[in-house]
């Protein structure tokens, strides 16, 4: 009921409109009163807005000696892209970050005390965690000191320990190998009590005997478990045993050797570091000891993941009969759980090729696998779809597409694969599209394009599917027009056109922007690059590539774009260049081992794969991978032999 004599009006659009205008003022630098200096990058903003979102910045602004001047805040330990994501969030309440950037956004949110953002990022990481990545996620959570995230990761590890034990990350962990001699008719206790005794033994070995953890891991340690449930150090026949734990798990210790003077060594490898977030500054708690997960894998054989003196490592424990027993009575462990298995025991072999040679194919990553669909070779335009598992180096077939299709690109949206446009071998201007659902292994049609097009770029961005550029029905002229598909309304709408007509371009998403790279205007190869901002629906020309090319592939790794292969107007090429968005610069990188035009280039896990294409003479079914540490490409893979 409206009180008599009062006018009451509520503008439903006011908040949204004001927020948008505030963000526009920030981007144009108007009325800004704070400069954030992040690793050499300067960002302007408004103190009042940031103070409302970040208690950390509020404290800085509140203690500023000149509240009316321009504040300068240095944040040298953060990723500039991550800080920009948080600035956009502060002004729009929308958090948009490329999956490769989420850990850095988390680190920045922790620094700025933006707890809600930190929690959202943590939940996102948990949603993407699987047996191949959970160890690196645990290292990250430990470095961040996030007990909530750490507990959830540990719960996942406890549930999937045996599966995790076959993964590469597990096999690279430091390992403590124990062989426990048992008196006749004596069995080892339950996991919990057993590893409590083991941890007590490790602590005493380090603190009292002067051993380092690294030295304990250099060789198999022999212990003795007696009939009265005591864990003895050394061979009891020598009369030099130490006692570690009895029925009530109280330690009874007799020093056997004097403490050493040398300090403890740091365990090498990936035991405690923040593997995927170089900007993280938090460290694991000092002198942390914890059993994360354990499993009895066979009779008297135990596997455990533990934190020993803040080092995340594996404990292998094997019980066998008394010292007089023959070594041949030891049960054989599987290779992945054996004492002998070391991270460098890998078989290097040529990567398995696809079943079909393919050029002009679509590639994408889905559920940790590489998907290669369609394309053409000397015989036909293909509708077959192959799936590559990096862990087994094996290709398998998925359900074929409904339509033979080449000269198209593929994207993953909401867990499903989308292919649109392209050529079927007879018509170079398809308007049809289809969607693959991995749950039912089948393809279904999607609404037709507004414009028939071939050689167009396709990319998922902010929950929608974009198709940009491409060639006209005659295949001689590039297009400027771009369309966007909403999977909720199942409809196509137009968005801003490109600045330059182009087809056979490489397209991808990074940091909430869409990039279209190279291509050709007619048949003249381009080195120009455009970036699309969905917030203001505009395309902007950015730094050009060093090499003009069409038919190249692009992938994202560590927040950077890698563009490889293509055709330079006269030859298929193998050169690769990298774009750093923080510097707006391109840099030449190591060449692929083979020239590849119209190949598929995709990131799976933390590895860039190049598949198929045309080398100037042959259609290819081969695969190669990029090693960022050595800046080299290789057609070989290393797999563990079990």
UniProtKB/Swiss-Prot annotation:
Knockout mutant characteristics: Mice develop normally with no gross abnormalities. However, they display marked sensitivity to doxorubicin cardiotoxicity with increased number of cardiomyocytes apoptosis. Analysis of hearts from knockout mice reveal vacuolization and edema of cardiomaycytes.
CDD domains, per the entry: BACK_NS1BP_IVNS1ABP, BTB_POZ_NS1BP
Residue segments, region Disordered: 257-281
Annotated Kelch repeat ranges: 369-415, 416-463, 465-512, 513-559, 561-606, 608-642
UniProt xrefs under Gene3D superfamilies: 1.25.40.420, Kelch-type beta propeller, Potassium Channel Kv1.1, Chain A
Record-linked InterPro entries: BACK, BTB-kelch_protein, BTB/POZ_dom, Kelch-typ_b-propeller, Kelch_1, SKP1/BTB/POZ_sf
Expression sites by tissue: Ubiquitous expression. In the heart, the highest expression is detected in the ventricles and the lowest in the atria. Expressed in dendrites and spines in neurons.
Modification Phosphoserine, positions: 246, 277, 322, 336, 338
Pfam families: BACK, BTB, Kelch_1, Kelch_KLHDC2_KLHL20_DRC7
Domain of life of the organism encoding this protein: Eukaryota
Biased composition regions of type Polar residues, renumbered to the chain: 265-281
Record's note on what induces expression: Decreased expression in various organs and cultured cell lines by doxorubicin treatment which may reduce mRNA stability.
Domain called BTB: residue spans: 32-99
BACK domain ranges (all copies): 134-233
Keyword Secreted attached: no
SUPFAM superfamilies from the UniProt entry: Kelch motif, POZ domain
Domain notes: When the BTB domain is lacking, AHR signaling induction promoted by IVNS1ABP is massively increased; Thus, the BTB domain inhibits AHR signaling induced by IVNS1ABP. Dimerization is necessary for proper splicing activity of IVNS1ABP and this is mediated by the BTB domain. The BACK domain is necessary for proper viral M mRNA export.
Assembly and interaction partners: Homodimer; through the BTB domain. Interacts with AHR/Aryl hydrocarbon receptor. Interacts (via BACK domain) with pre-mRNA-binding protein HNRNPK; the interaction is direct. Interacts (via BACK domain) with splicing factor PTBP1; the interaction is direct. Interacts (via Kelch repeats) with RNA polymerase POLR2A (via C-terminal domain). Interacts (via BACK domain) with splicing factor SNRPA; the interaction is indirect. Interacts (via Kelch repeats) with splicing factor SART1. Interacts (via BACK domain) with ALYREF; the interaction is indirect and likely plays a role in mRNA nuclear export.
Function: Involved in many cell functions, including pre-mRNA splicing, the aryl hydrocarbon receptor (AHR) pathway, F-actin organization and protein ubiquitination. Plays a role in the dynamic organization of the actin skeleton as a stabilizer of actin filaments by association with F-actin through Kelch repeats. Protects cells from cell death induced by actin destabilization. Functions as a modifier of the AHR/Aryl hydrocarbon receptor pathway increasing the concentration of AHR available to activate transcription.
Sequence similarity: Belongs to the BTB-kelch protein family.
Protein name in UniProt: Influenza virus NS1A-binding protein homolog
Source organism per UniProt: Mus musculus
């Amino acid at each position: 009921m409206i009180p008599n004599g009062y006018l009451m009006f509520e503008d439903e659009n006011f908040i949204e409109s004001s927020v948008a205008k505030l963000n526009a003022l920030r981007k144009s630098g108007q009325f800004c009163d704070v400069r954030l200096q992040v690793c050499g990058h300067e960002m302007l903003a408004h103190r009042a807005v940031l103070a409302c979102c970040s208690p950390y910045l509020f404290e800085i602004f509140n203690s500023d000696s000149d509240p009316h001047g321009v504040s300068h805040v240095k944040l040298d330990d953060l990723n500039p892209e991550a800080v920009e994501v948080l600035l956009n969030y502060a002004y729009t309440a929308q958090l948009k970050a490329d999956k490769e950037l989420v850990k850095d956004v988390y680190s920045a949110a922790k620094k700025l005390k933006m707890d809600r953002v930190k929690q959202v990022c943590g939940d996102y990481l948990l949603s993407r965690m699987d047996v191949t990545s959970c160890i690196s996620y645990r290292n990250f959570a430990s470095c961040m000191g996030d007990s909530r995230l750490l507990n959830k990761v540990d719960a996942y590890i406890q549930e999937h320990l045996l599966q995790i034990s076959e993964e590469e990350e597990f096999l690279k962990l430091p390992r403590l190998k124990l062989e426990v001699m048992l008196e006749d008719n004596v069995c080892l206790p339950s996991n919990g009590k057993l590893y409590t005794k083991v941890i007590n033994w490790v602590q005493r070995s380090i603190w009292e005997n002067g051993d380092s953890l690294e030295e304990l891991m250099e060789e198999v340690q022999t212990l003795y478990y007696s009939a009265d449930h005591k864990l003895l150090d050394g061979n009891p026949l020598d009369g030099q045993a130490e006692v570690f734990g009895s029925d009530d798990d109280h330690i009874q210790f007799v020093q056997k050797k004097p403490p050493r003077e040398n300090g403890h060594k740091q365990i090498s490898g990936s035991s405690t570091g923040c593997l995927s977030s170089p900007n993280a500054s938090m460290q694991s708690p000092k002198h942390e000891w914890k059993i994360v997960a354990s499993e009895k894998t066979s009779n008297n054989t135990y596997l455990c993941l533990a934190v020993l003196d803040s080092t995340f490592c594996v404990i292998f424990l094997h019980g066998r009969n008394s010292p007089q027993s023959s070594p041949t009575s030891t049960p054989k462990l599987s290779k992945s759980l054996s004492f002998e298995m070391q991270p460098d025991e890998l078989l290097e072999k040529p990567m398995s090729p696809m079943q079909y040679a393919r050029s002009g194919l679509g590639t994408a990553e889905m559920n940790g696998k590489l998907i290669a669909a369609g394309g053409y070779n000397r015989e036909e335009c293909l509708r077959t779809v192959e799936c590559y598992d990096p862990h087994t180096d094996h290709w398998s077939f998925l359900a074929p597409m409904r339509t033979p299709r080449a000269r198209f690109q593929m994207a993953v949206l909401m867990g499903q694969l989308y292919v649109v446009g392209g050529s079927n071998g007879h018509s170079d201007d398809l308007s049809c599209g289809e969607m693959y659902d991995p749950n039912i292994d089948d393809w279904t049609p999607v609404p037709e394009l507004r414009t028939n097009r071939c050689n167009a770029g396709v990319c998922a961005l902010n929950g929608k599917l974009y198709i940009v550029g491409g060639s006209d029905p005659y295949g001689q002229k590039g297009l400027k027009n771009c369309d966007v598909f909403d999977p909720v309304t199942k409809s196509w709408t137009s968005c801003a056109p490109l600045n330059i007509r182009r087809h056979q371009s490489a397209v991808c998403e990074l940091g909430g922007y869409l990039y279209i790279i190279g291509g050709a205007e007619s048949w003249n190869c381009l080195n120009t690059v455009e970036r699309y901002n969905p917030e203001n629906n505009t395309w902007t020309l950015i730094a050009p590539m060093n090499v003009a090319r069409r038919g190249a592939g692009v992938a994202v790794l560590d927040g950077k774009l890698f563009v490889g292969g293509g055709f330079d107007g006269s030859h298929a090429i193998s050169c690769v260049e990298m774009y750093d968005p923080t510097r707006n610069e391109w840099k030449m990188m190591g060449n692929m081992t083979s020239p590849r035009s119209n190949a598929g280039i995709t990131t799976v896990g933390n590895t860039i794969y190049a598949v198929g294409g045309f080398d100037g003479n042959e259609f290819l079914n081969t695969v190669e991978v990029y090693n960022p540490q050595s800046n080299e490409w290789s057609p070989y893979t290393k797999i563990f032999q079990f």
